[in-house]
Every structure is written in structure tokens, then in C-alpha cells.
């Protein structure tokens, strides 16, 4: 595909925090002398005991250890709430937009302080203190943020489990971190449908040792009739009436754990990613400010769920540490109509909008009409997160949503990294659709070949990071050996991201997908993202997912799942046309061997495509699909199985 370059517009540069020259100067300082750079920027948060040590990190085999600001003491809630009260107590901290468009509320910093203190006192009355783990299984309601910050206030460690996880998944995570207390809601609301959260908690607890969970706190969201276990369960509003709205914040060490967040391993049990207090907050707040070019008084909206790391870093901790107004959205982009995102932007005068490529692609399928009937004049910066954004979706987002006047920050990072690692900066970086562009301050990407040799210049290979940054995860909860094995054993002295990438002649990075999303066709390595981008460039295609499957001749064949735009029909003619299209675009080696038209793709409710399921169906092995409870629409799996193209009695 021809490479398009978008220059930094004067309007972006004129009001940006930094320009290209300043970025280069700061980046050079951050990698040549990280001690001085982070020693200075570590002061962006308040410390009850100032740090004297900045960086103490090692990626050495058998001795992986990551510590930042280790002799300092601070408290995250103090930094996200209390320090703002004198100057911005009456400013809105959180705008909550309900699933129902008629339901929304503004919570000021002063109100947030009172609510968080109340929640902290409710927890403290039930024995929660420093170092205790608390599991949160909540919908996107303000109480989710209150609970996170209440745990932080007490020095307790929160472990959020996304509301789409099944009782089995929830049970394994409660057990994994040893939570004695669970906070949930009677029911969640998403797209007009109810989600039985409390019932799922009850089911999960039945699978655990009887004496593990002592308390379940239930937030009343729908008022639905739910079973309450006497002595164990309590409604939050009743417990909150018994406590005051003042609660001192516990100063904790910089390396005290703030949260555990489980992420899927490529094998076996999910990993409990541990993030700590000081370095994480410095990095989350700094990336939020510079990546989104956040200015005081702006309204910022990240559409993620707090069940995922994006919600932790860029709905709650980063924005609130910066005294921002952050929007929390309970609903989905298509309810009650495809205009919902854009209507919310107009309603709350959103300036910065951060969403996932999968949401953009699904809305693209409905055409420009639902976007163009709204104004979106308040928008200034657009962001993308979660997976590489294909150039066609990037272009639609830029042109249709942003009216070609808003920069797009295509951010690359991971649960493990705590914050954004590779990204454009609005006033400093020329944009290339589909490229995450350049590293953030302190981040040193290196490209490595399969043998572990570091590659120079323009190249393609495995993406690693050479040195630590403050937001980096510290360990896998209860299993440091697994941490070393997963991230540091593949390439000596490097953090291996698990992603492949291409670096172009300008030093820009293009993420090509997980290394396990690489297909080896007749000895040729190919990132699935490239084939997907080609398919989505076809005018009739809304979305595509590509996986490998065993092929008698080639080793692996290419299996493409394609969702068409509204009104298009999946004919044999179109199937042939799409195969020819890819062949012409990338070359014969990239031609899909099998192509299945799919009304929908299996996605988690955060919008990630579940490629594991697609691989199994492509392999005609759908008896072992694993846990599909996190899917937004489990029914799509049945359709995919019914119409699979690789039944064993068919020729490949």
C-alpha cells in the first residue's frame, strides 16, 4: 500500500505542549540520562516522603528486578483527588454517561473525595487494610472508580475482573489473588440488556473454598431482585449510610502494589500483572498529558472499560492525577443507534476521544450518515488503542469523524507496560496511517531477528524494549519465575513484547500483530494484519480477521473471515474478487486460501477479536473453543461454525 504522510497542521502545533524539536530534545535526554530525566518528571506527583533513588532496574537473566523511586512514599488517591481540592474542588472530575442516553451525571472533585472516603470506610469496617486484595466485578458506573480509588486510599490492592467474564473465570481470579472481599452490582446494563453480575459472583463463590470470601458488597444499579447471603452480602448504599465521608490516606512505598490485572497467557492460566504505585502513576499521568496534548479544562473521553488496563490508566488514574475531566461510558457504540458515540461527544463537548479500531471499523460499516448528522466541533484530538489500526479505518476516522482537522494518536502499548510506549504526539509528529510512529520518552525499542540479533535501520522483526520505564509491570503475582520466563528469556537482557513490527526508513514503527499471529505460508512469514488491511481496503468490506490453518502443501494456509458493509451480499463472485484483490495488493503468497463471509466476528466486550476461536474454527476443531463467556455476542460463534469453509471432507 502506498504510504501517505500527514504533516503536523499549524493549528495543532500552535497550541501543543511540545513541537518536533522539543520532542527530540526531551527524548534524547530521557534515554541518555534516565536518572536525571525521571528524577525531574517524578516530581509531577506529590510525595509524602520524597524519593532520593530514581532507577534501580535489571533485565539480567535470573536477576530481573524493576524498582523506580523506591525510597519515596506517596498515595495514589491523594494525587488523584485531594491535591486538586484547593484549586479545583468544584470542577467536574467524572462525567458519567449511562447506557440510557437520558441518564448522565457530573461528579466534582469534592464529591469524588467524599464518595471515595465513604467507600474506603465501608471497606475498612470490613477489615480491609494495606496489602489486602479486593476483587471488583462491576459495570461502568461511578462506583467502579470510587472502589479503585478507595482501595488505593487504604493501600489495598484492587483486582478488577471485567464484567463479561464467566463465573469460572471470576472464581479463578478471586482465588489467584486471595481476595476476601468482592465488590459487585446487582446487575449491569449494556446496550439495553441486563448482565447478571451478582448471580455470577454467587456462582463463582460456590466454586471456591468456603472460608475464602468473607464479604460481598453489592451496588444497586438496576434494583433487580438478587439473592443476598445474610452475614456475607450487604448493599453498598446501606453500608455507606453507617460511615463518614472523611478517611485519611495511607502513605505507601513507591513499590507497593496498586493493582493486579489478569491478562491471558499464550499458554495456561491468566497471568496476574502487578503494577505498583509511584512509577505507574508518574508514567500514566505523564503519557496522558503529552500523548493527548491535554490542556487544563478539556473534556477527555476514553471509551474503554475499567476491566481492561486502558480503563485503569486512561479513564481513572492518568486523567485524575492531571486534574482532568474524564468521561465514563456505560453503554456501547451502537445503542440506541450508530450515532451514539458522536451524540455523546456533542452532548458533553468532548475535546479528546480515545477508542479502539474495532469500534471504528464496525461504525464504518454503517456509512458516514450516522456521523455526519452530528457536529463533533468540540473534538481536537482522536486516539486509537487496542490493536493496529488499518490505514482505511485510520483514514475514515481522520476524514469522517475528525473532518480532517484532528490529529490521530495511534498508541501502542500493553497491559504489561502500564502506559503508552510508541505513539505520535499531536504537535510534534508527522502521521502515517497505520503506524504507531515513534517511542515515548524513556522508551528504547529494538528490533530483533529470530536468532536474537539486533537489527539496524529499516527492518522487520520482533519488537523488544531495551531498558525499563517507570510504568513497567514488576512481576506476575505470586510467580516471579513466570514473569522472567515470559518476558525476558527469549532475548537476553531485553523485554520481549510478543509483537512483531516493521521499522521504516524514518524510524517509524508499524506493529504487524502478535508474533503468534504470523502465518508461515510455504516458508514465507506474513503478519495477519497486512492481509486484513488489504481486505478492509475493498469498498464492500467492513471488517476482516485472518488466521492460519494447517495446509497439506503449504504448511499453513490463509483463512479469512470477512464482514461486509450493510446491504452487500456474500456471493461466490465476491469471494473470488476479494481473493484476486489481495493477490494484486500484496502478492500471490498472501491470497486467502479460504474465505468465509461472517455477519459478525467473535469479540470481547472491550472489542478485541478472539482470534483463538477463529483459529479453532479454521482448523475444524471447534469442540475445544474454551471460555466464550467474554464474547459480546456468543451467537456469532454458532454461525461461524455452521458456515465454516474447512470441513475435513472438503479439499483445502
Swiss-Prot record:
Acetylated. Deacetylation by the SIR2-homolog deacetylase activates the enzyme. Keywords: Acetylation, ATP-binding, Ligase, Magnesium, Metal-binding, Nucleotide-binding. CDD domains: ACS. It catalyses: acetate + ATP + CoA = acetyl-CoA + AMP + diphosphate. Its cofactor is Mg(2+). GO terms for biological process: acetyl-CoA biosynthetic process from acetate. GO terms for cellular component: cytosol. The modification N6-acetyllysine is found at residue 608. ATP binds at residues 386-388, 410-415, 499, 514, 525. Its EC number is 6.2.1.1. Mg(2+) binds at residues 536, 538, 541. It comes from the Bacteria. SUPFAM superfamilies: Acetyl-CoA synthetase-like. It holds the Pfam family AMP-binding. CoA binds at residues 190-193, 310, 522, 583. GO terms for molecular function: acetate-CoA ligase activity; AMP binding; ATP binding; metal ion binding. Belongs to the ATP-dependent AMP-binding enzyme family. Catalyzes the conversion of acetate into acetyl-CoA (AcCoA), an essential intermediate at the junction of anabolic and catabolic pathways. AcsA undergoes a two-step reaction. In the first half reaction, AcsA combines acetate with ATP to form acetyl-adenylate (AcAMP) intermediate. In the second half reaction, it can then transfer the acetyl group from AcAMP to the sulfhydryl group of CoA, forming the product AcCoA. This is Acetyl-coenzyme A synthetase.
